[in-house]
Design a protein with these regions (language model features):
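Acidic/histidine-rich catalytic cores and adjacent linkers
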Residues: 66-184
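Short, basic/hydrophobic alpha-helical segments
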Residues: 1-11
């Protein structure tokens, strides 16, 4: 995509797939990386007893409900201590080591925070494509599978779902616009 002209990317949101994060750093070095909050929660839950998942879920959500990055960092440190006290050391280690990857969104306008913490919109599209391809079962070749996926994407683009404005990008460029106006 970079070779075809992709530029100006400021944020990449994904799970912690090593190949993806390394490629992003190599090809889009100016972009920040945001670990999907939902994927992070699932990773933490895999190290928590089933009876404690709900409690830990509330703890993790409290981190991301903070008003600033500093407050979120303080809350995360407190939660790491709480997890260690509750003898969930592996989960505590994971939170301590990786929670900062989920807090990148604090560097962007606060009206965007809710929408850039996860990659759920993309996950929703992928789930829809997967649902359609499972109905078919076996494809005669890769091209027919690609055709079905492309048809589904064309359908999504043509519906009201794709015409809704997901995020107002103006606040993201507002400081740049003000600087440009000051120079002029």
């Amino acid at each position: 995509m970079v070779e075809r002209g992709l530029k100006g990317v400021q944020l990449i949101i994904s799970d912690a797939c090593r190949g993806l994060t390394e490629s992003a750093a190599e090809y889009l070095p100016e972009a920040r990386w945001q670990r999907c909050m939902v994927h992070f929660y699932r990773n933490v839950f895999s190290h928590v007893p089933a009876t404690k998942v709900r409690e830990v879920s509330h703890m993790l959500k409290a981190i991301h409900a903070q008003e600033s990055r500093d407050a979120a960092d303080r809350k995360a440190r407190a939660i790491v201590d709480d997890l260690r006290t509750a003898r969930m050391n592996t989960a505590a280690d994971l939170v301590e080591r990786s929670v900062s990857e989920t807090l990148t969104y604090y560097a962007f306008p606060d009206i965007h925070w809710q929408k850039i913490r996860t990659n759920n919109p993309l996950e929703r599209i992928m789930r829809e494509i997967r649902r359609r391809t499972r109905v078919v079962g076996a494809f005669p070749d890769g091209q027919s599978c690609l055709n079905l996926a492309a048809a589904r994407l064309r359908y999504i683009v043509g519906t009201a779902w794709s015409t809704k404005c997901y995020m107002n990008m103006r606040p993201l460029y507002q400081p740049q616009l003000m600087q440009t106006e000051a120079v002029a």
